[in-house]
Amino acid sequence: MNKYELIQDTFHMLQREISPDTGIRLNMPCEEAEEMASLLLEYGLPALRTTRLLSIYIAIKLALLRHSECDNALNGEKLTRSVLDGDYLYSFYVQLCLQWNEHDLLVRLAPVIKQIQIRRIEGASYDDALLRCWELFLEMEEGHVRKSCAI
């Protein structure tokens, strides 16, 4: 499987997992997931787990993107929708981690995501922090590194 097939399979999986009642469209550019897809493929994980991990990553990225739309939302309805979608997607990634028994990942991601949110409020960049945390998690899981994901 190449990274583009992985991304496509992942979006299909996410579409099945997300409640249609939310009205949330999974309209993230594929480019946003390419680096993570490549990283996951490097580790030779089973295909299902690779797709699940990328699903969790995409849910987080979508939440970050939705909340970043709040900066440009001038009217109340669009602002409300961006906040609610982002909040739902943050809880959705937690749900996916629990559903797929990715407890160690959840423990590592939660503080980093909170740090990213704080940095964004302060106007700082977060681009590499999330991917770096994932990389450390995958290395730790493979037994290479025993580091914290703290940024």
Predicted features and spans:
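Extended, compositionally biased accessory segments flanking or bridging domains
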Residues: 3-4
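Mg2+-dependent prenyl diphosphate-binding active-site environment of isoprenoid biosynthetic enzymes
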Residues: 7-151
